[in-house]
């Protein structure tokens, strides 16, 4: 569903996606359930991308009884999923259930928390590791990070994705579970060719750049580092 006043941002409104997100938000959801919830949410979001953005074609099928005509999704061999470490790892695990033949890229990126936000509400970002497959004009690229807060990390990641692309991909999706209005604005304005997909738009960012109400630190909760 398009988001008002944002030409390239869309809400994923599937009932199971919203139900799963509610469980992820709950402070009582422990590590294993949280991680499994991110996997489940990634899978649902993958199916929503297939349903909303990918084409189908007719195919001849031989059943045990006769020959018939069915439909198949085209382009499933031209999917590139970019995992923004580390919080996106279980999220991407779910996406791979929807896109089992996807090529995968990995970018390790993190905020410089000590430096704090600048006057534009952005953090300096440290990129520690980049490994991306070849990206071509036939590819649908999904850059996954459960939390889109200030947009600082995602903007840095997308710079690397664009640098790696031999040509503009067929589709470029930024996928998150929860987004802040500020992050959608920053990323959407700087990368107008990307479609931003999110299950929820939360209220605001606090003074430290965390999404409120949010779901806490997705990486810490998934990997039990708190």
From Swiss-Prot:
Single annotated GO MF: magnesium ion binding
Activity regulation annotation text: Allosterically activated by GTP.
InterPro entries: PRibTrfase_dom, PRTase-like, Upp_A, Ura_phspho_trans
Domain of life: Archaea
Cofactor note: Binds 1 Mg(2+) ion per subunit. The magnesium is bound as Mg-PRPP.
Keyword set, alphabetical order: Allosteric enzyme, Glycosyltransferase, GTP-binding, Magnesium, Nucleotide-binding, Transferase
Pfam families assigned to the protein according to its UniProt record, in alphabetical order: UPRTase
Catalysed reactions listed for this entry: UMP + diphosphate = 5-phospho-alpha-D-ribose 1-diphosphate + uracil
Positions bound to uracil: 211, 216-218
The protein's name: Uracil phosphoribosyltransferase
EC numbers for this chain: 2.4.2.9
Function: Catalyzes the conversion of uracil and 5-phospho-alpha-D-ribose 1-diphosphate (PRPP) to UMP and diphosphate.
Protein family membership: Belongs to the UPRTase family.
Pathway: Pyrimidine metabolism; UMP biosynthesis via salvage pathway; UMP from uracil: step 1/1
Cofactor list: Mg(2+)
Keyword Glycosyltransferase found: yes
Organism, as annotated: Haloquadratum walsbyi (strain DSM 16790 / HBSQ001)
Residues that bind 5-phospho-alpha-D-ribose 1-diphosphate: 86, 111, 145-153, 217
GO biological process, one term: uracil salvage
Residues annotated as binding GTP: 36-40
SUPFAM superfamilies in alphabetical order: PRTase-like (SSF53271)
Signal peptide range in chain numbering: none
């Amino acid at each position: 569903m398009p988001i008002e006043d944002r030409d390239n941002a869309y809400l994923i409104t599937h009932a199971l996606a919203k139900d799963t997100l509610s469980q992820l938000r709950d402070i009582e959801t422990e590590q294993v359930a949280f991680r499994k919830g991110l996997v489940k949410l990634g899978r649902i979001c993958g199916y929503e991308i297939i349903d909303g953005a990918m084409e189908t074609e007719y195919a001849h099928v031989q059943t045990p009884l006769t020959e018939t005509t069915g439909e198949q999704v085209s382009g499933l061999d031209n999917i590139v999923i970019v995992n923004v470490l580390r919080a996106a790892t279980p999220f991407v695990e779910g996406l791979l259930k929807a896109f089992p033949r996807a090529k995968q890229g990995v970018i390790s990126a993190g905020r410089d928390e000590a430096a704090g936000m600048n006057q534009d509400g952005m953090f300096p970002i440290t990129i520690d590791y980049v490994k991306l497959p070849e990206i071509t004009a036939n590819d649908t690229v999904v850059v996954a990070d459960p939390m889109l807060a200030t947009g600082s990390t995602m903007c840095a990641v997308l710079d690397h994705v664009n640098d790696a692309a031999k040509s503009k991909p067929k589709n470029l999706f930024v996928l998150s579970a929860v987004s802040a209005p500020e992050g959608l604005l920053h990323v959407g304005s700087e990368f107008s060719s990307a479609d931003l997909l999110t299950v929820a738009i939360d209220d605001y960012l606090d003074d430290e750049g965390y999404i409120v109400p949010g779901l806490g630190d997705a990486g810490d909760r998934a990997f039990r580092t708190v």
